[in-house]
């Protein structure tokens, strides 16, 4: 697996006149899982978007090493296409494997994405990330909408990715059942 990781230094995020967090630093290396923890609205999603380079921090810097795959509230799969075709779009771009079976999607490949349930959509998004070949995964609330079985399977896939030399940053208000996880509480960086 290619080199991966990121270093965020003294990050601050502002929304309107409100500072969500400040002086947040984070160093993520290959093999690591970092849990960005906190209540809804505290700034976890904004931090994920800053780490991905989609949102400019109010202050601070982010250095990224290696390719990044992002899963957030935007599904990034064409809702009008059958799931198989929507996933193939990303396969053509990323030239990576197709982990549909790992996420229990084999029986859904002919179903248009717009007809998938919330949990099925979340599993499809995780399959897209896993198939990307990117060593660094940024996951915003990846377990939302998943039942206990698929939550466990998703966390197993995350641990397996890190065991192969990848790194994962997870923003979640839910507790995680991961063995090797470092938790960063966003509330510790509020003004």
Curated annotation (Swiss-Prot):
Catalysed reaction equations from the record: heme b(in) + ATP + H2O = heme b(out) + ADP + phosphate + H(+)
The organism's place on the tree of life at top rank: Bacteria
Enzyme class: translocase
Membrane protein topology class: Peripheral membrane protein
Keywords in alphabetical order: ATP-binding, Cell inner membrane, Cell membrane, Cytochrome c-type biogenesis, Membrane, Nucleotide-binding, Translocase, Transport
GO biological process: cytochrome complex assembly
Residue numbers binding ATP: 38-45
GO cellular component: plasma membrane
EC number: 7.6.2.5
UniProt KW Nucleotidyltransferase keyword: no
Location of the ABC transporter domain: 6-189
An example Gene Ontology molecular-function term: ABC-type heme transporter activity
Main location: membrane
UniProt xrefs under SMART domains: AAA
Compartments (UniProt record): Cell inner membrane
KW Isomerase (keyword) present: no
Cross-referenced Gene3D superfamilies: P-loop containing nucleotide triphosphate hydrolases
Similarity remark: Belongs to the ABC transporter superfamily. CcmA exporter (TC 3.A.1.107) family.
Subunit structure: The complex is composed of two ATP-binding proteins (CcmA) and two transmembrane proteins (CcmB).
Function statement: Part of the ABC transporter complex CcmAB involved in the biogenesis of c-type cytochromes; once thought to export heme, this seems not to be the case, but its exact role is uncertain. Responsible for energy coupling to the transport system.
PANTHER family, sorted: ABC TRANSPORTER I FAMILY MEMBER 1 (PTHR43499:SF1)
Name of protein: Cytochrome c biogenesis ATP-binding export protein CcmA
Annotated gene: ccmA
């Amino acid at each position: 697996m290619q080199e991966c990781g990121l270093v965020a230094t003294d990050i601050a995020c502002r929304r309107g006149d409100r500072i969500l967090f400040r002086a947040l630093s984070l160093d993520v290396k290959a093999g690591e899982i970092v849990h960005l923890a906190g209540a809804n609205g505290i700034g976890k999603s904004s931090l994920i978007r800053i780490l991905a380079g989609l949102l400019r921090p109010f202050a601070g810097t982010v250095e990224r090493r290696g390719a990044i795959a992002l899963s957030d509230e935007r599904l990034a799969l064409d809702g009008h296409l059958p799931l198989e075709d929507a996933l193939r779009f990303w396969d053509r771009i990323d030239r990576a494997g197709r982990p549909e079976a790992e996420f229990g999607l084999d029986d859904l490949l002919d179903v248009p994405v717009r007809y998938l349930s919330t949990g099925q959509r979340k599993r499809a998004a995780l399959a897209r990330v896993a198939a990307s070949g990117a060593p660094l995964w940024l996951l915003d609330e990846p377990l939302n909408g998943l039942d206990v079985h698929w939550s466990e399977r998703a966390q197993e896939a995350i641990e397996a990715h890190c065991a192969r030399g990848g790194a994962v940053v997870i923003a979640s208000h839910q507790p995680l059942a991961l063995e090797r996880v470092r938790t960063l509480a966003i509330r510790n960086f509020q003004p």
